[in-house]
Amino acid sequence: MQFSIATIALFLSSAMAAPYSGNSNSDSYDPCTGLLQKSPQCCNTDILGVANLDCHGPPSVPTSPSQFQASCVADGGRSARCCTLSLLGLALVCTDPVGI
């Protein structure tokens, strides 16, 4: 009896110690890894990298650099960008996403 209790306790403790990865993919694509430029955007007009006009979030969650760029191009010929601040279609301080 004691052996089975010890065995059960061992299995439970090892199961509780195992890291939970959930449904996330460890190789998932994060297009905006900069310190400030954390907001992925699809923009029409770039003004010297300081301001971008007619911007909004990508139509789908980016899974790769080519998919992010293709989804923005398909959404009215926009460019994939990573911006610091976006409000009402105006995005400020934008850079190119990782891999593009």
From Swiss-Prot:
Keywords: Cell wall, Disulfide bond, Secreted, Signal, Toxin, Virulence. Changing residue 74 to R: In strain: P1. Changing residue 16 to L: In strain: P1. The keyword Transport does not apply. Residues 1-25 form the signal peptide. GO terms for molecular function: toxin activity. GO terms for cellular component: extracellular region. InterPro entries: Cerato-ulmin_hydrophobin (IPR010636), Hydrophobin_sf (IPR036686). Its main location: secreted. Induction: Expression is higher in mycelial compared to yeast-like stage. Aerial growth, conidiation, and dispersal of filamentous fungi in the environment rely upon a capability of their secreting small amphipathic proteins called hydrophobins (HPBs) with low sequence identity. Class I can self-assemble into an outermost layer of rodlet bundles on aerial cell surfaces, conferring cellular hydrophobicity that supports fungal growth, development and dispersal; whereas Class II form highly ordered films at water-air interfaces through intermolecular interactions but contribute nothing to the rodlet structure. Homotetramer. Further self-assembles to form highly ordered films at water-air interfaces through intermolecular interactions. PANTHER family: HYDROPHOBIN (PTHR42341:SF1). Belongs to the cerato-ulmin hydrophobin family. This is Class II hydrophobin CU. It comes from Ophiostoma ulmi.
